[in-house]
């Protein structure tokens, strides 16, 4: 179980057997103000979370803009069934609001990559590039919809009139769109042990580098600079030998825990 709570929104992820999951959702929806809470489901063969984790944050996803308040106004929602048709219009610009390492493994055809390594850099990117999009309708998307709630509020506050975003994010689109009809290319990065999911929302082909957190393809993991649990070709020069030694010790403890049939929680 993983829970993040801020004044703007609460985000919860539950990994459980289906019968328990249904009971959890029923319980949450019975709480005051939670009857219409939005849920998404995907299947996995193993537990995606090692432990229960609850965090109180100023922002669920840090944007660093003091006047952002998605509870007051957001862009207009586009349902997954209408997304592809809408985004193919000549007067629509499609922007992926996620980080570049997420976009590298999958995105919508023809979408713009802001090439940012954190969400708080999105406002700066917009300020530098907004003149290119003058007079256009702006359609944005992200993994589950939270970053779009905030980025659409930001653009509306900047005076942009026609702001839209994908309802429920990429995961909702993949759930409700047949692959043969889809405008999605690649896999979708997710923030749990699955690392990525494919179009069927099953665990994808990517694994995560423990050191830098970047998603690694099979080719990346076959690189001579890749050391499992320690570093990859993308980050091998980013960490000192002391830190790499600590990563190796951690990996050793993980393997020992696995031999004992236990999960390593560190």
Residue ranges and their predicted role:
Residues 16-74, 99-138, 146-266:
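Rhodanese-like catalytic fold shared by cysteine-dependent sulfurtransferases
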Residues 4-7, 80-82, 124-128:
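A generic local structural motif
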Residues 95-96:
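Structural scaffold elements adjacent to functional motifs in cytosolic proteins
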Residues 3-20:
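Short, small-residue-biased leader/transition segments that mark boundaries at the very start
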Residues 11, 85-87, 131, 202:
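Generic structural signal for beta-strand residues in well-ordered domains
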Residues 68, 73-92:
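Internal catalytic-core helix/loop-beta-alpha segment
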């Amino acid at each position: 179980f993983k829970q993040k709570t801020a004044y703007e929104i609460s985000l919860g992820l539950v990994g459980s057997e289906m019968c328990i999951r249904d009971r959890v959702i029923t319980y949450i929806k019975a709480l005051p103000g939670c009857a219409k809470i939005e849920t998404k489901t995907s299947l996995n063969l193993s537990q995606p979370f090692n432990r229960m984790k609850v965090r109180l944050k100023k922002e669920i996803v840090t944007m660093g803009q003091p006047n952002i308040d998605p509870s007051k106004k957001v862009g207009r929602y586009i349902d997954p069934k209408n997304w592809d048709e809408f985004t193919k219009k000549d007067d629509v610009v499609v922007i992926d609001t996620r980080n570049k390492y997420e976009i590298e493994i999958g995105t919508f055809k023809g979408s713009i990559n802001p090439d940012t390594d954190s969400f708080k850099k999105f406002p700066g990117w917009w300020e530098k590039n907004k003149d290119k999009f003058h007079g256009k309708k702006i359609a944005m998307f992200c993994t589950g919809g939270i970053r779009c709630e905030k980025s659409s509020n930001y653009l509306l506050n900047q005076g942009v009139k026609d702001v839209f975003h994908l309802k429920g994010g990429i995961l909702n689109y993949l759930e409700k769109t047949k692959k043969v009809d889809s405008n999605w290319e690649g896999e979708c990065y997710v923030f749990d042990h699955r690392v990525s999911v494919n179009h069927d929302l099953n665990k994808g082909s990517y694994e995560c580098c423990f050191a830098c957190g970047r998603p690694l393809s099979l080719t990346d993991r076959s690189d001579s600079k890749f050391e499992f649990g320690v570093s990859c070709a993308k980050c091998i020069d980013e960490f000192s030998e002391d830190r790499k030694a600590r990563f190796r010790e951690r990996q050793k403890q993980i393997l020992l825990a696995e031999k004992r049939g236990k999960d390593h929680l560190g």
